[in-house]
Swiss-Prot record:
Protein name stated in the entry: Laccase-3
Residues annotated as glycosylated: 24, 138, 169, 218, 314, 334, 395
Molecular-function GO terms, alphabetical: copper ion binding; hydroquinone:oxygen oxidoreductase activity
Record organism: Botryotinia fuckeliana (Noble rot fungus)
Domain Plastocyanin-like per the UniProt entry, residue ranges: 1-95, 101-252, 319-454
GO biological process assignments: lignin catabolic process
Role according to the record: Lignin degradation and detoxification of lignin-derived products.
SUPFAM superfamilies listed in its UniProt record: Cupredoxins
Binding site for Cu cation 3: 75, 380, 437
Reactions catalysed according to its record: 4 hydroquinone + O2 = 4 benzosemiquinone + 2 H2O
Metal-binding recorded as keyword: yes
Length: 454
């Protein structure tokens, strides 16, 4: 990954990007940063800007209105899968004490074939995405069996100290369960949101999500494995079970761990019981009436060149125009944008909007087929309130009463369960054009996104 960017809460941040690539355009998105009243700085080609052309330079300017951990990455198709990403640390209060900040810990899948070539292959194949060839922790990993080279990321800790570790899933396709052998995590943030601390031996981290955890060095002096494992239904990786890093106590006789994993039950769903540290409440009245629904589905058709795979919302795969970003329409007062922009207007400021996101059967060669896949849904420009999730089809009469309006989970990436639903809410308090999309890079490049404008 690229260098980690550091700032303090409230700072004005300026970052200059130069595109030194010979062919591709690019643009940098500051993941999770709300860009409050600075939509032009969101860094999304075709939405808030034109791609930055080879040889050109652009300076992004925005304020750190949140604090915690995040990452920046290219938003030019699946380009970030080649490593065009890095961590962001914005210093601010913490909900639990610690002695040492170990910084960001990026966890990612890795492919030996260039991601643009893979993306084109996936878009024209009914076989689904390929397995990752390996995983990387902070950009490093030992090569799989039968290959040579590489190394584990290593960390040295001192007995009796407490360490803050900033976990970020920067993958293209893989979600992970993560753990440090013999050491519990005290979890203190969920994305950019400080939470009431809770303890876990393993945590699930979907693509784009972040968790800050505190590790207490209270075990026998030695070396211990940190593990990142892909679960069934959460993507596939050819080196699964061997994606690790090493934590070694000062004074340990060996830097090679012999520790064993804590048993756990695998899953591909979000952490539960997350309670934001500062209370927020969502009005419950509007959801008693009509509910806006966004249906997520795959479509596989065939043309003269073979299969064509798209993912869409409400039967439409987004198709943006890099030559004319949607923000240009908005600034010009022109609402004659193409329907393929998948733009939903939210005309009223300071209004609460409620959305049911539902995975529905797709269309494969003209036939309805259920291809149930979990989707990490990411919203730009806002933290959303996650009122509930479930499997099957959402029914407001049955599921509505169980939705949580009293200080619900708040974040910017949440997992839509495979074949299931999620209900989220946010207030229109940040003018602009904001993308909401699946953060599986193959899916968003195949169209799984909408825009909110208001």
């Amino acid at each position: 990954p690229g260098p980690t960017l550091y700032a303090d809460w409230g700072d004005m941040i300026q970052v200059t990007l130069k595109n030194s690539m010979p062919d591709n355009g690019t643009g940098i998105h500051w993941h999770g940063l709300r860009q409050y009243h600075t939509c032009t700085e969101d860094g999304v080609p075709g939405i808030t800007e034109c791609p930055l052309a080879p040889g050109d330079t652009k300076t992004y300017t925005f304020q750190a209105t949140q604090f915690g951990t995040s990452w920046y990455h290219s938003h030019y198709s699946s380009q970030y899968g080649e490593g065009m990403l890095g961590g962001i640390v914005i210093n601010g209060p913490a909900t639990s004490n610690y002695d040492v900040d170990l910084g960001v810990y990026t966890i990612s899948d890795w492919y030996y074939t260039p991601v643009f070539a893979l993306g084109e292959r996936i878009a024209h194949s009914q076989a689904g995405p390929p397995s990752g060839d390996n995983g990387l922790i902070n950009g490093s990993m030992v090569a799989p069996a039968g290959q040579t080279g590489g190394k584990y990321t290593t960390n040295t800790i001192t007995a009796g100290k407490k360490y803050r570790l900033r976990l970020i899933n920067t993958s293209v396709d893989n979600h992970f369960m993560v753990s440090l052998d013999n050491h519990a995590f005290t979890v203190i943030t969920s994305d950019f949101v400080p939470i009431v601390p809770y303890t876990a031996n393993w945590i699930f981290i979907g693509i784009g999500q972040r968790y800050d955890v505190i590790i207490t060095a209270n075990q026998t002096v030695g070396s211990y494995w940190f593990r990142a494992e892909v679960q069934n239904g959460c993507g596939t990786n050819n080196n699964n079970g061997n994606i690790k890093s090493i934590f070694t106590y000062s004074g340990a006789a060996s830097t090679t761990p012999s520790s064993s994993a804590t048993p756990y039950t695998g899953r591909c769903t979000d952490e539960t019981g997350i309670i934001p540290f500062w209370d927020s409440f969502v009005p419950s009245g509007p959801l008693s009436g009509n509910v806006e629904q966004l249906n997520v589905a795959i479509n596989i058709g065939v043309d003269a060149s073979g299969p064509i795979v798209t993912w869409g919302i409400n039967l439409s795969a987004i198709d943006v125009d890099w030559k004319k970003p949607i923000l240009q329409y908005v600034l010009d007062g022109n609402n004659s944008w193409p329907a393929s922009e998948n733009l939903i207007e939210l005309p009223n400021a300071a209004q609460w909007y409620y959305w049911v996101i539902q995975e529905v059967p797709g269309n494969v060669n003209g036939n309805p087929v259920s291809i149930n896949v979990p989707h990490p849904m990411h919203l730009h420009g806002h933290d959303f309130f996650l009122l509930g999730t479930g499997v099957g089809t959402y029914n407001n009469t049955i599921n509505g009463p169980s939705l949580d309006y009293d200080n619900p989970t708040r974040r910017d990436v949440a997992m839509l369960p495979a074949g299931g639903w999620m209900v989220l809410a946010f207030q229109t308090d940040n003018p602009g054009a904001w993308l909401m999309h699946c953060h599986i890079a193959w899916h968003v490049s195949e169209g799984l996104a909408v825009q909110f404008q208001g």
